[in-house]
């Protein structure tokens, strides 16, 4: 559903931020 898609996108953004901070 739409909510699941939003959750996945938020997780992708969070992961990207974490990787960006670490590097």
From Swiss-Prot:
Which of UniProt's keywords are assigned here? Amphibian defense peptide, Secreted
| Any single biological process term in GO | defense response
Q: Where in the cell is it found?
A: Secreted
User: Can you cite an annotated GO cellular component?
Assistant: extracellular region
Q: What is its main location?
A: secreted
Q: In which tissues is it expressed?
A: Expressed by the skin dorsal glands.
Task: Give the UniProt family note.
Answer: Belongs to the frog skin active peptide (FSAP) family. Aurein subfamily.
Give the protein's function: Has no antimicrobial or anticancer activity.
What is the official name of this protein in its record? Answer: Aurein-4.4
Native source species:
Ranoidea raniformis
